């Protein structure tokens, strides 16, 4: 009589299902929702997939599960934390969004991400103007002084300045990555990534350790930057810039949206064309000076509940 390995829907199952060709995150999410409290054997999973018109042999499933066990072992060796969407440790702020990650991989110290009301996303162009680069640094540093944690994406330009400024003030910052945690993109920020970890912050990803960044993963990670934050502050962006994805997610998630408003002359620069849209069409709160920042901070603190 064949004895089937018995498993429950957990990290091992999620990694295995995500590793199967042709099965996306949303389909895996539906399976999790349907069978979350049921212990399943690999044969059960074979039948479930077959019923949903996904045809894999039992041998293929066993091989995938073995590879997934190796991935989990590698995560342990690399000191990467893994939290599945069914865990009580999964952040509530991510449960609320339309398409929550099935898994979170985190490197570093991440207790502060559970306090969404104390986290602010500071984001902007990879190729900002000199003024934009300086503004990103100054705003993030000021917010860190006021004891806010900074969420950003480790990209060159505004993101880099936001992380650096937060660290300068001995604040805590989280970088949301568009790839697995066994690599850093861009390479120029490898040292910054390590500094973030060493100084009490963290790197966060929803992708398997060796998964490379793709165009769509940069967009997907943007929804996490806004979800983990009480508000999103845009420093500088073109109307077609990647920052606009985070802006759209912020609006969809009902997050407070603020945007730097430069002088009328500076606002004519195409690099700020996104700022004009965010301010004029999306009704973002304008940030023109430190007084505006103080007003924003007061509002955020009065609306923490």
Question: Whereabouts are the PLM-identified features?
Answer:
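Short, positively charged patches
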Residues: 2-134, 141
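Glycine-biased, small-residue-rich flexible motifs in mid-sequence functional cores and linkers
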Residues: 85-305
């Amino acid at each position: 009589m064949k004895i089937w390995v018995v498993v429950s829907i957990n990290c091992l199952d999620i990694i295995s299902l995500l590793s199967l060709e042709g099965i996306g995150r949303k389909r895996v999410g539906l399976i999790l929702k349907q069978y979350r409290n049921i212990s399943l054997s690999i044969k059960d999973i074979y039948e479930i997939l077959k019923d949903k018109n996904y045809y894999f042999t039992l041998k293929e499933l066993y091989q995938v599960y073995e590879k997934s066990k190796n991935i989990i072992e590698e995560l342990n060796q690399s000191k990467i934390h893994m939290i599945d969407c069914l865990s009580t440790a999964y952040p509530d702020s991510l449960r609320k969004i339309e398409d929550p990650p099935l898994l979170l991989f985190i490197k570093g110290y991440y207790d502060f991400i559970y306090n969404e009301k104390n986290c602010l996303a500071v984001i902007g162009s990879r190729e900002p103007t000199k003024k934009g680069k300086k503004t990103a640094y100054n705003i993030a540093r000021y917010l860190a002084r006021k004891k806010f944690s900074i969420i950003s994406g480790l990209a060159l330009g505004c993101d880099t300045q936001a992380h650096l400024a937060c660290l300068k003030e001995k604040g805590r910052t989280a970088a949301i990555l568009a790839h697995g945690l066994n690599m850093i993109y861009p390479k120029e920020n490898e040292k910054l990534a390590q500094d973030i970890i060493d100084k009490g912050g963290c790197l966060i990803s929803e992708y398997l350790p060796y998964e490379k960044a793709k165009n769509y993963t940069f967009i997907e990670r943007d929804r996490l930057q806004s979800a983990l934050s009480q508000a999103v502050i845009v420093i500088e962006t073109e109307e077609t810039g990647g920052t606009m994805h985070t802006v759209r997610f912020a609006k969809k998630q009902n997050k407070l949206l603020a945007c730097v408003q430069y002088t009328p002359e500076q606002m004519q620069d195409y690099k700020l064309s996104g700022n004009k849209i965010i301010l004029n069409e999306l009704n973002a709160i304008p940030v023109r000076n430190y007084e505006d920042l103080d007003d924003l901070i007061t509002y955020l603190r009065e609306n923490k509940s």
